[in-house]
Design a protein with these regions (language model features):
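Walker B catalytic acidic pair
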Residues: 3-5, 203
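Residues immediately C-terminal
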Residues: 7-10, 38, 129, 190, ...
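Conserved interdomain linker/interface between the two RecA-like ATPase lobes of SF2 helicase motors
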Residues: 28, 53-130
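Short secondary-structure boundary/capping segments
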Residues: 44-51, 137-140, 197-198, 216
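Conserved segment of the helicase C-terminal RecA-like domain
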Residues: 216-238
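Conserved helicase/translocase motor-coupling segment
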Residues: 110-204
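Post-DEXD/H (motif II) to motif III coupling segment of the RecA-like Helicase ATP-binding lobe
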Residues: 6-83
Length: 238
């Protein structure tokens, strides 16, 4: 089982396709998971496994093109089959360009947006920017209402912080704070099932922006502050 398969870079993709072909040859089941896999990558991964299964060549169905979301694509010796699935009702979300020039301005905006409570996440593209933004947020909100998360923490500290994220902002959290800001880097995009009322993010490729937005109003909650009941993602632009 390989999760977040879209995150593979070009180097990893070459090895992944080779591994899929080998696994297909031995008939080993493989599950690939992604919420933002482009059609071309889906096609390449399906074709790699299909080559191993020995089902490519004349008469094989094409695997290119757009399909609905969510969907399950399966490969067997008989070929490729796509099953579109009825998903849950989509939560309307707005992406709003926002011009903020400094970490201090970000902290002041959050102080205003969370005046009636709520949990927000700020996603910066570098560790340095995350650290600077966290210091500004902490100076406004205090240490108890601010958390920093990035990849440079030691492994034990990173595990502890990930666990804290799930305890405070996970689906089944019973400790969700009244008001809190998490400042993070891209590490929060994947694998953490957390839910925030408001999001601020640096610009990023669209597939990564969609991954980030997946942490915004992720779960049904009837207790969100009134001003945060509309899911908003503020993109920090110069």
């Amino acid at each position: 089982v390989i999760d977040e398969v879209h995150a593979a870079d070009e180097y990893m993709e070459t090895y992944l396709e080779a591994v899929l072909t080998w696994l297909g040859m031995y008939g080993i089941p493989v599950v690939l998971l992604s919420a933002t896999l482009p059609p071309a990558r889906r096609s390449a991964l399906l074709e790699a496994y299909r080559r191993g299964r020995g089902s490519s060549g004349a008469g094989a169905e094409p695997v290119d093109g757009m399909i609905g979301y969510p969907a399950i694509s399966t490969v067997s010796s008989a070929g490729v089959c796509v099953h579109e699935i009825q998903g849950e009702a989509e939560v309307p979300k707005r992406i709003i360009p926002t011009s903020l020039g400094s970490p201090r301005e970000i902290a002041e905006l959050l102080d205003h947006e969370l005046a009636e409570g709520g949990c927000a996440v700020v996603i910066r593209n570098t560790v340095r920017e995350a650290q600077e933004t966290y210091e500004a947020v902490r100076s406004v909100f205090g240490r108890e209402q601010a958390t920093l998360l990035h990849s440079r923490f030691l492994a034990a500290e990173r595990v502890a912080r990930d666990r804290c994220m799930l305890e405070l902002f996970g689906k089944d959290s019973v400790q969700r704070p009244f008001r809190h800001v998490v400042v993070a880097t891209q590490v929060i995009e994947q694998s953490l099932d957390v839910d925030f009322d408001l999001m601020l993010t640096d610009p990023a490729p669209m597939d990564l922006v969609l991954q980030r937005i997946g942490r915004l109003h992720r779960h049904d909650r009837g207790d969100r502050p009134v001003r945060l009941r509309e899911a908003r993602c503020l993109v920090l632009v110069e």
